[in-house]
């Protein structure tokens, strides 16, 4: 393999293996137990979501004491989550033909407003049934409509009458 610029991207830097890069794992000092304990105490995990590799919720035994305002805020968040879950379940029961992902998207697009979500889903339901009336049984690239509407027949008849009347399209110059 040639060293130098690549023909694909002449501005790309040459590849340097991980072991030869500055600050690689080989060059670092082994971590002591005391250093690990200091880092562990500095990180405060976000309970309930397993952030920072701490696993899942650790319960109230490990959580630090919280101020009353934090407890009220957390209680409000839990109530909002519960309300959102109940709204989603209601929508899933009301619109069984839609996926949970679709309902979630519509609900979040309406800023978690249940009434607006129901209105939007009703509109989508109406439009989808109207569209189904015009769809053929099978969709194929070669499909040609079998029924020609009256207005298109009249247009075709009118254009054929003008060409058969002996009037020819004359070249008109715009000079």
Swiss-Prot record:
Organism the protein comes from: Arabidopsis thaliana (Mouse-ear cress)
Gene3D superfamilies: DNA helicase RuvA subunit, C-terminal domain
Compositionally biased intervals (Polar residues): 166-175
Domain CUE: 83-126
Domain remarks in the Swiss-Prot or TrEMBL record: Contains a PAM2-like motif, which seems to be involved in the binding to the PABC/CTC domain of PAB proteins.
Region spans: Disordered: 145-175
GO molecular-function term, one example from the UniProt record: ubiquitin binding
Residue window of motif PAM2-like: 7-17
Cystine residue pairs: none
The protein, known as: Polyadenylate-binding protein-interacting protein 6
